C-alpha cells in the first residue's frame, strides 16, 4: 500500500511567549519508516502531542489520511489497579472485536513482542520498565494501525527487545503502515529508517529520503551537520 498517511503544515506552538515549535511541516508515507531526530528540547515531543491532539496548536494544520493511529509514548502511564489482560480486552471491546478474536489477537501479539502472556494476569503497575514499554506497544498494535507513532522507541528495552522492535517496524512498513520514530538513539534508527526529519530549536531544518541523490551519508553525520549548521533548512 502506498500514499500519504499524514500531512503536517505550518505547525507552531508557544509557551509563555517562548516559541517551542515554529512552522513545522512534513508528511509521512505509507510503507516507510520515518526517523524524527532532534536534540533534547528541540520540540519533538511537543510536535507529536500537537499532531495527536493532546496539545492545542497555535497555528497550522494536521491532515490524517490513515484509518487507525497507534501511539506509544516515551513513558507509558497506566491505572495502577488494572491488570494487563483486562486493559487489552477493554481496548479490543471498544473497537468492536468479538471475544474469540480478542483472545487470539492478544496471544499473537504477545508472541511477536516476546511478552510473557502470564504478565497479563498481573497489574500493569507491577511490570518492569521494559515490559511496560512492550505492553504499550502491544496495546497500540492490537487495533492494527496504519499510522504508528513512537516516542523514544528503544527506551527501557534490552538488546534483544531492540532487535525485536526493529523487526516489528520493518514488518509494519512492509504491511503498508507509516511508521514514525522520534528518538535520540541514532545508531538504532539508522538500521531501519527510510526517511528522516530533523528538528532544531523548534524548526524542521531537514527532510530527506534515504535514496535521495548524492553520496551516501550515515545518519549521525547527517544529523550533526544539520544541527550545527547556522542556517540550513531543506
Residue ranges with predicted function:
Residues 139, 143:
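Conserved signature/switch motifs of ABC ATPase nucleotide-binding domains
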Residues 123-130:
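Conserved ABC ATPase signature
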Residues 162-175:
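Helical segment within the ABC ATPase nucleotide-binding domain
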Residues 89, 101-119:
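Conserved ABC ATPase "signature" region
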Residues 28, 53-56, 60-68, 206-208:
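Conserved ABC transporter NBD signature motif
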Residues 148-152:
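Catalytic Walker B motif of ABC-type/P-loop ATPase nucleotide-binding domains
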Amino acid at each position: 500500500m502506498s500514499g500519504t498517511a499524514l500531512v503536517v503544515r505550518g505547525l507552531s506552538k508557544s509557551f509563555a511567549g517562548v516559541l517551542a515549535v515554529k512552522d513545522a511541516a512534513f508528511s509521512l508515507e505509507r510503507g516507510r519508516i520515518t526517523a524524527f531526530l532532534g536534540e533534547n528540547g528541540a520540540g519533538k515531543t511537543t510536535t507529536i502531542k500537537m499532531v495527536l491532539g493532546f496539545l492545542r496548536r497555535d497555528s497550522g494544520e494536521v491532515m490524517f489520511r490513515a484509518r487507525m493511529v497507534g501511539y506509544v509514548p516515551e513513558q507509558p502511564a497506566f491505572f495502577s489497579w488494572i491488570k494487563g489482560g483486562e486493559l487489552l480486552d477493554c481496548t479490543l471491546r471498544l473497537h468492536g472485536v468479538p471475544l474469540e478474536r480478542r483472545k487470539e489477537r492478544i496471544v499473537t501479539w504477545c508472541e511477536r513482542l516476546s511478552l510473557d502472556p502470564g504478565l497479563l494476569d498481573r497489574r500493569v503497575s507491577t511490570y518492569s520498565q521494559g515490559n511496560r514499554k512492550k505492553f504499550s506497544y502491544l496495546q497500540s498494535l492490537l487495533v492494527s494501525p496504519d499510522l504508528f507513532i513512537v516516542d523514544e522507541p528503544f527506551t527501557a528495552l534490552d538488546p534483544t527487545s531492540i532487535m525485536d522492535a526493529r523487526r516489528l517496524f520493518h514488518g509494519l512498513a512492509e504491511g503498508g503502515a507509516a511508521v514514525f520514530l522520534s528518538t535520540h538513539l541514532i545508531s538504532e534508527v539508522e538500521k531501519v529508517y527510510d526517511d528522516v526529519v530533523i528538528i532544531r530549536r523548534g524548526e524542521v531544518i531537514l527532510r530527506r529520503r534515504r535514496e535521495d541523490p548524492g553520496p551516501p551519508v550515515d545518519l549521525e553525520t547527517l544529523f550533526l551537520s544539520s544541527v550545527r549548521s547556522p542556517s540550513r533548512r531543506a
